[in-house]
Design a protein with these regions (language model features):
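Polytopic transmembrane helical bundles with strong interfacial aromatic enrichment
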Residues: 1-268
Length: 268
């Protein structure tokens, strides 16, 4: 697998994350209903440019989405022409397959704007990011088992930030909420990587723990969007669950390592 393809894949994944963060910022600033609620046109000169700062935010989100979309198409081309790992090919294909529905949902968030549509827009974007993150994990070598414990400890150190920035206890500015999503997506990505690497080592229970942690972290992000009237304290409960999951991962790996070294860890 070429370094160029790997770098482009990682870059497009990072671009997708930035696009999601810009979209969340747009939603929290109420800019999604600017551009006179028109899509794909805006409210400025000839409908191609924004008329004010609020519509500029929405316009920038659309422009970035277009750029990221074209980059992903190029990544898909390279995935099928320049590298041999079929898992990576199909993961990137799945991400690009979801793009048309995501574009349609993005348009509907402007013209319709219901809680269900905006939630579907977030879910689809999350699935695209998940497919790309999985593809990234599959392009790197599987680390040794002891690195999984290090990963769990590092992820556990991030959970307090996930807990503190969610806005469930104090009213926080939009910039802090975007920080919450940044931390949360990175945390979820690390947990997904842990699940895939645990699977590669045959560690079934560790894989399930990592996967559960990633799922709860994502659910916290969905609840934090405040679209369905769910109690914001659920995000705090979720953060504590993730922390307990990571403690269980570290404890299990430590116990197995002490009991019989690497061989015992593999025999899950």
């Amino acid at each position: 697998m070429s370094r160029r393809f790997r770098n482009l894949l990682f870059g497009s994944t990072a671009g997708t994350l930035v696009l999601m963060l810009v979209g969340l910022y747009t939603a929290y600033k109420g800019a999604g209903l600017t551009c006179e609620q028109r899509w794909p046109f805006c409210d400025g000169w000839m409908g191609l440019f924004p008329a004010n700062f609020a519509s500029f935010i929405e316009w920038s989100h659309r422009l970035l989405a277009m750029v990221v979309g074209f980059v992903l198409l190029y990544v898909l081309y390279l995935a099928w022409r320049r590298q041999d790992d079929r898992r990576v090919k199909w993961a990137v294909t799945a991400a690009v397959f979801l793009l048309p529905s995501q574009i349609i949902l993005g348009a509907l968030t402007v013209t319709e704007f219901t809680a269900l549509i905006t939630a579907a827009h977030f879910v689809t974007a999350s699935l695209i990011l998940l497919c790309l993150a999985v593809a990234c994990v599959w392009t790197v070598d599987v680390p040794p088992v002891d690195r999984l414990r290090t990963l769990a400890i590092a992820a556990g150190a991030v959970v307090p930030f996930h807990l503190a920035l969610d806005g469930s206890v104090f009213v926080v500015p939009v910039s802090v909420l975007i920080g919450f999503y940044t931390v949360s997506f990175l945390l979820a990505g690390a947990l997904v990587a842990g699940a895939l690497w645990a699977h590669a080592h045959g560690l079934g229970r560790i894989r399930l723990l990592f996967a559960a942690g990633a799922t709860v972290t994502w659910f916290d992000m969905l609840v934090a969007r405040r679209k369905f009237g769910l109690d914001q304290a659920l995000t705090d409960v979720g953060a504590l669950i993730v922390l307990l999951v990571l403690v269980a991962v570290v404890w299990t790996l430590s116990q197995r390592s002490q009991a019989g070294g690497l061989g015992a860890i593999r025999a899950d």
